[in-house]
């Protein structure tokens, strides 16, 4: 069993772009997007994964993630709720920490979210100047919620 502890933030500006170390294209869908549990299928440039996540409590939840054959993932994505989530993930190494910046495309174009994974819920994080409002506890920003209420519909 794994435990995922992460915090999510909006971005204030584009200063983060000068810190990019890596980028990856991601396509993902949800076989189940219930608030109590999600079952996600994800393909990246290199791998395919199936992930089961439990309900979020504060900033943590149980997470089980397994690599699966790419062809299986492509077939499973056809069974997922729509729209699929499409995004580019940028890896930022900043002051000894790894940040993931997701730039959403398609139905969620215009949305940018920064995430940082932690070892403990009470772990202190020094926020870079480009980090804006924290949205860790706002369910609208869960990827599984973005398939039901895409960002383009928020306006």
How does the language model describe each region?
Residues 1-155:
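Phosphate-end processing signature that detects enzymes handling 5′-triphosphorylated RNA
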């Amino acid at each position: 069993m794994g435990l995922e502890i992460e915090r999510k933030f909006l971005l204030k500006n584009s200063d983060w772009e000068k810190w990019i170390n890596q980028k990856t294209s991601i396509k993902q869908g949800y076989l189940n997007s219930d608030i109590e549990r999600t079952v996600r299928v994800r393909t990246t440039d290199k791998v395919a994964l199936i992930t089961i996540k439990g309900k979020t409590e504060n900033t943590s939840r149980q997470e089980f993630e397994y690599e699966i054959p790419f062809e299986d993932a492509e077939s499973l994505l056809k069974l997922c709720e729509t729209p699929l989530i499409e995004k580019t993930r940028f890896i930022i190494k900043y002051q000894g920490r790894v940040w993931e910046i997701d730039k959403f495309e398609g139905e969620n174009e215009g949305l940018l979210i920064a995430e940082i994974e932690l070892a403990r819920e009470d772990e202190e994080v020094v926020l870079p100047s480009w980090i804006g409002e924290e949205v860790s506890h706002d369910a609208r920003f869960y990827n599984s919620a973005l398939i039901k209420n895409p960002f383009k519909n928020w306006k």
